[in-house]
Swiss-Prot record:
Organism: Xenopus tropicalis
One BP annotation, GO: maturation of 5.8S rRNA from tricistronic rRNA transcript (SSU-rRNA, 5.8S rRNA, LSU-rRNA)
Organismal lineage: Eukaryota, Metazoa, Chordata, Craniata, Vertebrata
Keyword terms of this UniProt record: Nucleus, Repeat, Ribosome biogenesis, rRNA processing, WD repeat
UniProt similarity note: Belongs to the WD repeat BOP1/ERB1 family.
Compartment(s) of residence: Nucleus, Nucleolus; Nucleus, Nucleoplasm
SUPFAM superfamilies per the UniProt record, alphabetical: WD40 repeat-like
Chain positions of WD repeats: 394-433, 435-475, 515-557, 560-598, 601-640, 644-683, 699-729
Residues of the signal peptide: none
GO cellular component labels: nucleoplasm; PeBoW complex; preribosome, large subunit precursor
Protein's UniProt name: Ribosome biogenesis protein bop1
Function: Component of the PeBoW complex, which is required for maturation of 28S and 5.8S ribosomal RNAs and formation of the 60S ribosome.
């Protein structure tokens, strides 16, 4: 019996079937549970819910027994167990089942009483694409009711059905539900913003439970909870998080509140001695133009209008007239009448003052030093020649031209003393001197390292000289190359005559002599050393001639020369030919036989030109002391014009390996500049003057006549009118 009572008192074990008792002994088992509820085992079993249930059952049975036996006390009834018969037990069980079934839904407050299916409170959107709306208790599908009404049937139903307006569709059952009057009334009240319950009075009189009178006893005498005087763990965690945030700098203290008034006086800090605020933006009116000569009472005759000009002035509109009045002449100032346009001009002036807007011209104050480009310091651009190292003496007259061998070991110079001298660069020793028939105007060493050959301009001839210096094999190969020429069977007519040197001239080093009809001014070699060009100072069509050494053939590349040719040059890598006239430099394409570019020098008289080893840049010197740098990829106008020299420029030159170029002038100085050309076409060349080299004496108003760089070292040679050649390293 105790085991059965304990199982029935337990919560989860009460649901299991009880084999010890049948349905007939239900009242007996209940009575035993009531009797055993006061035992020690039930008190210390730990099942609080079973104890409460047993006490409730005990009270129900005791009340029933008291009603049946009104003369006995509850203790006596509890002590005497009642063992009913089988028929009484069945009837009692039936009576207990009836009120239990009736009381099942008395206190049920569920909102799902009217649900006719068992799908549960789930979103019906889950089954919108299925033919069923859920499952019943047995796991079978609950199919949706058939809704085969089309729009016409729905419209007829709307017109004919009087309850259509109070019919709604239930999504959970899939059926149309007709709202009752109470439900319609509830909907209308909610639409009006009223409470759903009709009997609810929101304005019922309030009862002030706590009064102003101090009461002796508290309202509630409930003891304080244990958690009220135990530190809270949640607050501890919050405090630890706040401390960590403060340490990490995530929480900053509040900034001190600014108690300054929101409205303050704008002119509180105004200096009383300063200009008033309304005059700070004052724009003064433009002044009236001063009177001119035409407004004089005795103007010059050229300001007086003739009759034709007067008629034309009168026919013009007042807005188109250059002068708003007719100039007049009076014999004296006393004869001048009053000015008739005075009031009109004052009125127009007043209109201009208050109708015409004024604009303040913002003048930018720019520091002049900011306009100067920031150039690197010269010491950061080394190496470049800085000091005079050697002086080559031996010529008796001014040295007009110099040239350096491709190896850089030998130097050749031509002078007005009719000699060509060969010097050793390292020692300054004159290795050989060749006497010619006249003054040497130009000289050039063959750039081909396989040939030892020098071309010099003497009067009407160009002389080719083999100095016999350096490697004997190269000297012999040069003579063999010149002597191996075989004349063609039919010689065409040429503008010049080629002749070979013999006897004493051959022993002095002369090999060929090319005679021209006029004096030769300049000679220059092609980069391969087979072609060389000469310039004849003449206004005719044959100012420029190109000679070929291997075939001993000469030709005139131009039918007509525009302007007087000053200098010519070959492009170092491309088939271009530069021709410098007095004002411009023309670039010709020898393959296409056409003019490629025309560079405008903006100079009065071009004296010399030089081409950068890369071939994209060119410098041009002039007699008006200007040096123009041309970037041929950029423009046909000078990229930069340098005016460093005080007198005429005589020569300019590029270095073949270093970013250097130099210019020599009649002021006796040689200026060396750093000229860096970048491979990036978007970056302009960098030009920085680095050194001014002096040393030449001015003779007959002439200074430095020629400048040339050493082929491999950052050295520069200069020849001057003082009959000397100087080396700067």
């Amino acid at each position: 019996m105790k085991k059965g009572s304990k199982r029935e008192a337990g919560g989860p074990q009460a649901e299991q079937p009880e084999p010890l008792f049948s349905g007939e002994d239900r009242s007996l088992s209940d009575g035993n549970i009531v009797d055993e509820s006061d035992s020690e085992e039930s008190q210390y079993s730990g099942l609080e819910d079973s104890g409460s249930d047993s006490t409730e059952d005990e009270e129900e049975h005791s009340s029933e027994e008291i009603q049946q036996n009104p003369g006995k006390s509850p203790k006596e009834i509890r002590k005497v167990p009642h063992r009913p018969s089988k028929s009484e037990a069945n009837s009692a069980a039936a009576e207990e089942d009836k009120p239990s079934a009736a009381k099942e839904y008395e206190n049920d407050s569920s909102d799902e009483e009217d649900i006719r299916n068992t799908v549960g409170n789930i979103p019906m959107e889950w089954y919108q694409d299925f033919p069923h709306i859920g499952y019943d208790l047995d796991g079978r599908k609950i199919f949706k009711p058939l809704r085969s009404k089309d729009q016409l049937e729905q419209f007829l139903d709307k017109m004919e059905n009087p309850d259509y307006w109070r019919t709604v569709h239930d999504k959970k059952t899939g059926q149309d539900v007709r709202l009752t009057d109470e439900q319609v009334d509830l909907v209308e009240r909610l639409q009006r913003g009223q409470f759903g319950d009709i009997n609810y009075d929101p304005y019922q009189p309030s009862i002030d439970f706590f009064t102003h009178e101090t009461m002796i006893h508290p309202v509630t005498n409930r003891p304080a909870d244990k958690r009220s005087f135990i530190p809270s763990l949640i607050e501890k965690e919050k405090v630890s998080k706040l401390v960590h945030a403060i340490k990490m700098g995530w929480i900053q203290p509040r900034k001190p509140r600014d108690d300054s008034p929101a409205y303050y006086d704008l002119w509180a800090k105004e200096d009383p001695n300063a200009i008033l605020g309304r005059h700070k933006m004052h724009v003064p009116a433009p002044k009236l133009p001063l009177p001119g000569h035409e407004q004089s009472y005795n103007p010059p005759p050229e300001y007086l209008m003739s009759e034709e000009e007067r008629l034309a002035w009168e026919q013009q509109d007042p807005e188109d007239r250059k002068v708003p009045f007719l100039p007049q002449r009076f014999p004296c100032l006393r004869a001048v009448p009053g000015y008739a346009r005075f009031i009109h001009e004052r009125f127009e002036r007043c209109l201009d003052l208050y109708l015409c807007p004024r604009q303040r011209k913002m003048r930018v104050n720019v520091d002049p030093e900011d306009l100067i480009p920031k150039l690197p310091k010269p010491r950061d651009l080394q190496p470049f020649p800085t000091v005079q190292s050697l002086i080559y003496r031996g010529h008796k007259d001014l040295v007009r031209c110099i040239s350096v061998a491709p190896s850089g070991q030998w130097l050749v110079s031509g002078s007005d003393d009719c000699t060509v001298r060969f010097w050793e660069v390292g020692t300054g020793r004159c290795m050989k001197s060749v006497l010619l028939e006249g003054a040497v105007k130009s000289i050039s060493w063959n750039p081909n390292p396989g040939l030892v050959l020098v071309a010099a301009c003497v009067e009407h001839s160009v002389v080719l000289i083999n100095p016999g210096l350096g490697d004997r094999l190269l000297c012999g190969a040069t003579d063999q190359h010149i002597g191996g020429y075989q004349p063609p069977e039919e010689e065409g007519q040429q503008p010049v005559s080629w002749g070979e040197a013999e006897g004493t001239e051959y022993s002095n080093g002369l090999r060929l002599c090319i005679k021209h009809q006029k004096a030769v001014k300049q000679v220059t070699w092609h980069a391969r050393g087979d072609y060389f060009a000469v310039v004849l100072p003449d206004n005719g069509n044959s100012q420029v001639l190109i000679h070929q050494l291997s075939r001993r053939r000469s030709q005139n590349p131009f039918r007509k020369n525009k302007g007087q040719v000053q200098k010519v040059l070959f492009h170092p890598t491309r088939p271009f030919f530069f021709v410098a006239t007095q004002r411009c430099v023309r670039v010709y394409n020898l393959l296409k036989q056409e003019l490629s570019k025309k560079l405008l020098t903006n100079c009065k008289w071009v004296s010399s030109i030089a081409v950068h080893p890369a071939g994209d840049n060119l410098i041009c010197g002039s007699y008006d002391s200007k040096l123009a740098w041309f970037d041929m990829d950029l423009s046909t106008k000078p990229y930069k014009v340098l005016r460093h020299h005080k007198k005429a420029l005589r020569a300019v030159s590029y270095h073949k390996q270093y970013p250097l170029f130099a210019s020599g002038s009649d002021d006796g100085s040689v200026i060396v500049c750093h000229g860096m050309v970048y491979n990036d076409l978007l970056q302009n060349p960098l030009i920085v003057p680095v050194k001014v080299l002096r040393g030449h004496a001015i003779h007959r108003d002439l200074g430095v006549l020629d400048v040339i760089f050493h082929p491999t070292q950052p050295w520069v040679f200069s020849s001057g009118a003082d009959a000397t050649i100087r080396l700067y390293t």
